[in-house]
From Swiss-Prot:
Family affiliation: Belongs to the CCC1 family.
Family annotation (CDD domains): CCC1
Catalytic activities: Fe(2+)(in) = Fe(2+)(out)
Species in which this protein is naturally found: Tulipa gesneriana
Protein name stated in the entry: Vacuolar iron transporter 1
Amino acid sequence: MVIAGVSPPTPSSENLLQEHEEKHFTATDVVRDVIIGVSDGLTVPFALAAGLSGANVPSSLILTAGIAEVAAGAISMGLGGYLAAKSEEDHYMRELKREQEEIINVPDVEAAEIGEILAQYGLEPHVYNPVVNSLRKNPQAWLDFMMKFELGLEKPEPRRALESAMTIALAYVVGGLVPLSPYFFIPFAKQAMITSIAVTLLALVVFGYIKGRFTGSNPVLSSIQTAIIGALASAAAYAMAKAVQSV
């Protein structure tokens, strides 16, 4: 179908499309899960270990408590990620069923909504009416269009909930082992805590830089921002731990 005012693709334009390589990063859900897992993993076990270090307990006890917290935190965070992704999937399916019923029961209203959506992009009725008619002949394409452009919902991946749970849990474990690593090698808790602070800050800087590279933001700015936010969060958690100990 040729839309008025729009030239059909020519062989040369099709060749250009084939030669052009998009460099957009689209795995935003995975990046979000990794950020959630690693950032929490770097912060919570560090605060626990630092708080126990101030109580003059041996490194072995801190290590045992820290590993137990990492295991429990990974399970909890993973379960939270699973439930969140599952809720999104359930919401999508409910809206999909509702939209299917509306297309069957009130097709003229739904067709008018297509026109309203396309008009928001500056298209005139004589331009978008052929598009509306084409979509009415293809119910599945019509349904997909309404889900995406009317409701703003993307179809979740079938295994998204499980993948989210595994990604967050694994990222939490990786992040949590970083501040605990000095306690494996340094028997004196306060010395291990100083090393843990340095290692955790370095990990936050590296993590922020990598995050910036993947998300397209300034890597240096991202690393500084991540380090500052992580340091403030860790300091707040440490202060709360010390306050509880003093009660």
